[in-house]
């Protein structure tokens, strides 16, 4: 009886060829940027090619990061950051214009960009997406909206099932944390101090408390839902301030929906959260 032949004889298995690490440039070294660095530096899958900061020589103390060992990779010049030819730029700057300029410069060089800077992306998301496509690059910005909450992914899933009519959501963690503390009897200044201590509020909280951050989030979500974004300057905003204490139970809500002739959007404080 002949043996059954399954196929041609295979060569003995050999170890897989090691993949080259992904070359990553990090723009921004604040709370989020430093956290990203602490994850990337010890991971052999990644090579940090540069870090963009305002003051490269400033002494930094973050647990788990030996800044002295990577001091030569710090720069204040975006051109130097990109000259290292990273595969990807992680853009985590706090400035809208600087972030926007860096994103454009990277995409024009065919470098993939992952951004957590909603103020930068929301300036012109359609143009940035087109720029990325024109140069064969990828632009991802889920981190710019909702922190760890998959807001953009949720909208995309809803859109795949049918047209989106509108959305309402709590879009800013700082303001809603402060509203909870105000409900508990804290003063505005106390609530703001606690928000900073909890890692919610920036040193300059104006973007949050004046509603600019929520308005930028609305623009990004509207772009995903409707393919167009309302003018950020034209979005009505109710600010949270020390002079006017909100009604107990208030929440800051971002709203955008289709209306005849376009989109209606606003940032409001609602006592019932609806």
Short names for language-model regions:
Residues 27, 31, 35, 76, ...:
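Conserved active-site and cofactor/substrate-binding residues in soluble primary-metabolism enzymes
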Residues 2-109:
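N-terminal glycine-/serine-/threonine-rich beta1-alpha1-beta2 phosphate-ribose binding loop
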Residues 27, 91-93, 116, 123, ...:
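Structural motif
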Residues 164-176, 236:
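NAD(P)-dependent dehydrogenases' Rossmann-like dinucleotide-binding region
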Residues 112-114:
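A short hydrophobic/small-residue beta-strand
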Residues 181-182, 190-274:
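Substrate-binding/catalytic subdomain of NAD(P)-dependent oxidoreductase enzymes
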Residues 33, 37-38, 87, 129, ...:
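Predominant activation on well-ordered alpha-helical scaffold segments within soluble catalytic domains
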Residues 98-105, 118-155:
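Rossmann-fold NAD(P)-binding glycine/threonine-rich loop
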